[in-house]
Design a protein with these regions (language model features):
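Short acidic-glycine motifs
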Residues: 1-418
Length: 418
């Protein structure tokens, strides 16, 4: 990692990460490796009653050698990882009785009927009448709320919360292949191809909502041709191309839950590739049930980069001069669909006593009646991108008058066009 004093050929960064891939040799060599981590080998966290689930295995191999001795070599490497990591969710949830509209349990606030809202005869503002026995009649319960209640876990702890300990899975595979060809003693060519595949499954805080996949696929191809024109004059041409796409799916993506629940207004405005996923529900005082707002899912990130560079290095006396330029074409394309299938917020404002709100109203009572405080929907989903071409020309001279001092002259010119 270079954080300062790097060459003029590098720019537009606070630091440079230099990475190299090994080339093959005249001898055939190979390596196998495996790195294992497991909760059975770990100590318990100080604040946890038990050890968290962890199963992580990194493994791979490299092999390299000659294709034609002294002329053509190859090197290949593979690395894989399989990980299962435990997570802990402890949700504040309503009781099964509350999901049926029964708020008569101990410690619950008084629930007022919003249909009885009327002017306060003895003052300003409005008043309401409580539901008899603090129970909402079944005929008043929202069909949409009753549909989504199936995804809300019941309390399973002595404190009245719903504890859930799923594991998050992560599978990765990486492959790199490189070839080196010595055309002559003064002309050398190499090419490298790298492939990366990432597959992750993220669990929701509510187990019935399931898991959402995160997928990453990337390819990188690089090639270089180096010529030693004279013992002190070296010419290098490089080309690189990078393609990559990241896909984050929503929870239950592909299932039209709004239509199943009877929520209208979404079927006519679907967006290809993101049809159906779980909406977002937020209740004051309870754990939210988030889906699309989790990492702004569903979304995609698509990138394409081409880069060509041409450099000439000249060594004369105590001078090491380098001149050249590069051109880079960059085309990003992003989509995200946060709140695309709806974001409903319930605060208890519809079931409180407007004349004296303290100790009255409940956000889940508002939910049971189908009366949100706010409803949001982002439409159409965000789509943004474009393309640009970046040009850079530079000159760089390292001059060493003594062993202790190294002046550096680095003029350069950059052009960026969108």
């Amino acid at each position: 990692m270079q954080q300062n004093a790097y060459s003029a050929e590098f720019s537009r960064a606070g630091g440079m990460l230099n990475a190299t891939t090994k080339s093959g040799t005249n001898d055939l060599h190979g390596v196998l490796f495996d790195f294992l981590r497991n909760d059975k080998l770990d100590a318990r966290s100080f604040f946890s009653p038990r050890r968290e689930i962890l199963k992580r295995n990194q493994f791979g191999a490299t092999v390299g050698g000659p294709v034609i001795r002294n002329r053509f070599f190859f090197m290949a490497s593979y690395e894989g990882m399989r990980e299962r990591q435990g997570l802990v969710f402890n949700n504040i949830v309503p009781t099964a009785a509350m999901k049926r509209g029964d708020f008569s349990g101990p410690g619950l606030p008084i629930i007022y009927d919003p249909l009885t809202t009327r002017p306060n005869p003895s003052g300003t503002g409005t008043i309401r009448t409580p539901f008899p026995n603090n129970i909402i009649p079944e005929s008043r319960l929202s069909a949409q709320a009753r549909f989504f209640n199936q995804f809300i876990a019941d309390p399973n702890t002595s404190s009245g919360t719903a504890a859930f300990a799923p594991s998050r899975s992560l599978d990765q595979d990486q492959l790199t292949v490189r070839g080196d060809w010595n055309l002559t003693n003064n002309h050398k060519f190499f090419a490298r191809w790298s492939w990366h595949d990432n597959r992750q499954q993220d669990p929701n805080a509510y187990p019935a909502v399931g898991r959402a996949p995160l997928k990453t696929h990337a390819h990188n191809l690089g090639a270089s041709f180096t010529s030693t024109l004279r013992p002190n004059l070296i010419h290098e041409v490089r080309y690189n191309v990078l393609t990559g796409i990241i896909t984050l799916e929503g929870f239950m993506q592909g299932r039209d839950l709004n239509t199943e629940a009877g929520i209208k207004g979404f079927t006519e405005t679907r967006r290809p590739g993101t049809d159906g996923s779980f909406p977002d529900f937020l209740w004051s005082g309870y754990s939210a049930m988030r889906s699309s707002s989790f990492d702004q899912r569903p979304k995609t990130q698509d990138r394409l980069v081409h880069e060509f560079s041409d450099n000439l290095t000249w060594i004369r006396g105590r001078h090491i001069a380098k001149f050249g330029g590069k051109v880079r074409y960059y085309r990003p394309y992003f989509t995200d669909s946060k709140q695309y299938v709806g974001d409903w917020s319930f605060t208890g404002i519809n079931t409180e006593n407007p004349a004296s709100p303290t100790g009255t109203g409940n956000s889940f009572a508002d939910w049971a009646l189908g009366l949100p405080a706010t409803v949001l929907r982002a439409f159409p989903g965000n789509t943004f991108g474009g393309s640009g071409t970046y040009w850079q020309f530079f000159g760089h001279d390292d001059f060493n008058p003594t062993f202790a001092v190294e002046p550096r002259i680095s003029p350069k010119r950059k052009i960026f066009r969108c």
